[in-house]
Amino acid sequence: MRVPIITTLLTLALTGLSQAASLGVETTHGVECNRKTTKGDTVKMHYRGTLAEDGSQFDASYDRGTPFKFKLGAGRVIKGWDEGLLDMCVGEKRTLTIPPEYGYGDRGIGPIPGGATLIFQTELLEIEGVPKDEL
């Protein structure tokens, strides 16, 4: 009888871990397109980042008036961005809810405390090198 109980507890613990690490992706403004973002694309985004705990803003490209440019899926941004911005159309907007495992983990960075869940409002402005008529 002990083996099934231990197995059940282990299964519940592992299920809890996988749920804790789930990335939330909500499309807030959908767009139809022929060409969506893929791993390796260089993209330009606008974003606003806030802490889930209290809603305080820690960064926003909108405030600077300058989009953020990076290569998607190359590990140059947090894992939540590399995964949460795939299959996106130019003009689409998404809200990403990024748990610590997909963000900055226990270490934090700057105004972001360790263990923080992050909320990013994102907008895809451009997939570099893709002509507008192919979008």
UniProtKB/Swiss-Prot annotation:
GO cellular component: endoplasmic reticulum
Any one biological process term the GO annotation gives: cellular response to farnesol
PROSITE patterns: ER_TARGET, FKBP_PPIASE
Alphabetized SUPFAM superfamilies for the sequence: FKBP-like
Activity regulation behaviour: Inhibited by both FK506 and rapamycin.
N-terminal signal peptide: 1-20
GO terms assigned for molecular function: peptidyl-prolyl cis-trans isomerase activity
Source domain of life: Eukaryota
PPIase FKBP-type domain mapped to chain residues: 40-128
Job description of the protein: PPIases accelerate the folding of proteins. It catalyzes the cis-trans isomerization of proline imidic peptide bonds in oligopeptides.
Family membership: Belongs to the FKBP-type PPIase family. FKBP2 subfamily.
Protein's UniProt name: FK506-binding protein 2
Native source organism of the sequence: Emericella nidulans (strain FGSC A4 / ATCC 38163 / CBS 112.46 / NRRL 194 / M139)
